[in-house]
Amino acid sequence: MFIGINAQIFDALKDVAKKKVTEKATNLVGENVKNAVTQEAITTNFKDCDTQNIKSPEFASDKTFKTLCSADFTEKGYVLTPGYYEIELKSFCLKAGTYAPSKGDGYLYAPLKGPKKEIVSKLVKNWYNHPEIEQNDVQALLWAIIAKASFKNLSTDLQLVAAKLLSPKDILALNKMGLDFVPSGVMSDLKSSLPKPVQLVLEAENKMRQLFSSSNYNYSELEKYAMLAGFNTEKSSIAYGTWGLHPSGFWVSYHPSGYSHMKVRIYVPETAGTVYYIPSNDVAVPANTSSQRLMLSDVKDCR
């Protein structure tokens, strides 16, 4: 009799232990999925900006700016002596699920940061030497990386573009990364406790992953998920056109027109002497977290 009771107790204890192990494994899998979904490929944000050294948008409003549209771009960048300059460049969106730039958003310089910063930097920098590649194709690749899309799910055309701009080692790294579309029910659970702006970003990234995994999508569909409809109504703490001190010793003011075009104004003070400016080292970051981070390219877009 005691043997039978002990056996029942032992079986019950085994069931409890098995249930706990199963729950622990389930929680671990859930936590891993949450980490994979919520980890940002590019982490650059407004906290990376120097908000102490700024000048009013009205600074240098009475000055004449020398255009760099016909200037030579060298390995060191644009060679600038003391004075006032401006250049128009092609730029890229580095954050999906956000509002497009508007006159209400002020931008400051920040460095490129995050787990995928090297691959993102190479894509944009190497594009300068491949004028045959469309800007939209580079942007689509950037969105794929930012959305943490599985490289194997990308179209053959995009994979070929990546092969032109990246090394075999980089391609191998991309092959190892990425997620598939996460079912809506799972996504709802993952993002339920997160701030609304973060939820919108994660939802946009997930929808973009779904598009990349389909065989039939176009750029405008990707763009629709990357951009929130309307304008950001949140008042920016930094005015449009505000000047910020660049780490290279000059002052810079960003004037985006949409996410794909950027006018940059530069002031090189006498104390800085000769400086070198490489636009693709810059990320223009808005004070509003719901607006788009913009990465500059070295490709001119003079109009």
Question: What positions do the PLM features span?
Answer:
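Extended, helix-rich scaffolding/adaptor regions
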Residues: 12-17
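Boundary of Sec targeting at the N-terminus
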Residues: 7-8
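Long, low-hydrophobicity ectodomains and other hydrophilic envelope-associated domains
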Residues: 163-303
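Short, surface-exposed polybasic-aromatic patches that bind anionic ligands, especially phosphate groups
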Residues: 28-132, 136-140, 237, 268-296
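Mature extracellular/secreted ectodomains of secretory-pathway proteins
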Residues: 84-87, 91-207
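N-terminal signal peptide c-region/cleavage motif recognized by signal peptidases
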Residues: 2-4
